[in-house]
Amino acid sequence: MSLFSRKVVLIEETSFHMGEVDYTKHSLYDNIRSYPMEVKAGKSLYVKISSTNGVDVSIVDNKGYNVKFQEHVTSEFVMGPVPIKEKGTMALILGVFAGDRTDVTMSAWME
């Protein structure tokens, strides 16, 4: 880590519940969430996540390609460094199977 590098928080640490029945959604469950993040080229992206019953985590680049994926994350897990090649919008996508419920805590940052 460089002397002048700084941690830029993209998503503050937050906790929430996933998997509840939601009649407003097409699948009838709140089982997929996406979080867009504005990123800068030349940096690295990190995501810290933990859940009670397992959650699938995907990081998607600004072209729509999956650059990192981890299935069934339960204990505290840091995904990264994921190199950022172009300035733009990347996305963090979280998912659980329909009917599964889990409590999720996550945050994301660039260095």
In which residue ranges do the predicted regions lie?
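Edge beta-strands of jelly-roll/beta-sandwich modules across compartments, strongly enriched
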Residues: 55-56, 98-111
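Surface-exposed beta-strand/loop patches in noncatalytic accessory domains
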Residues: 10-27, 50-80
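Non-catalytic, beta-strand-enriched accessory regions in extracellular/secretory proteins
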Residues: 20-40, 44
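Residue-level signal for short segments within beta-strands and strand-turn junctions
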Residues: 38, 59-63, 110
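Predominantly extracellular/luminal regions of secreted and cell-surface proteins
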Residues: 1-13
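Noncatalytic accessory or regulatory domains flanking protease catalytic cores in secreted, cell-surface
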Residues: 64-103
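A general secondary-structure signal for short beta-strands and their flanking turns/coil
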Residues: 32, 42, 52, 101-103
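Hydrophobic beta-strand segments within beta-rich accessory/binding domains
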Residues: 36-51, 57, 90-96
